Amino acid sequence: KYLEGFVREDGGIHAAETTHKNYETALGLVCFSLANKTGKYDAIIKKGDAYVKSMQWGVSDDKQASDFEYGGAGYGKSKRPDLSNTSFFLDALKATGNDENSEAMKRALIFVSRCQNLETEHNTPPFAAKKPDGGFYYTPAAGGSSQAGVDEETGALRSYASMTYAGLKSMIFAGVKKDDPR
């Protein structure tokens, strides 16, 4: 009942003045999906699913698959995407019934793959080969960023645990198989 008070007409599930619409809506969708035993929240879930998908980079903007922002989710349309927001976005997609064949999941996997310190056919940004430890960092967008900093020796964006968890979980949700080199 409490969470219903945050449902917006446009499908968002968030506080009125928040800058964290993606995070809040994603968590709200997970909650409503878990509580939807009788179908009571079907309409909220459907609108919320469309809402989070509209926030994904590459949907209603001019970003192409070759752009580092493509497929990611951020704090809002004007903010750069990052792996933390994209991970929550994928939680919402999974909770609302999207599988690896969903176009939104496919786009997100492109972004998630680019957050990994591992050069593959799916990941060719300049950071990927500098320190190929297989871990993940915050974002390849806007020149790249890691909350763990830059490796002084190689210039690589450092991988760190919370983003590596987010990246691995996101890849599993997006259907990456265990024999995939990523």
Where are these regions (language model features)?
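Preference for long, amphipathic alpha-helical scaffolds in soluble/luminal domains
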Residues: 1-182
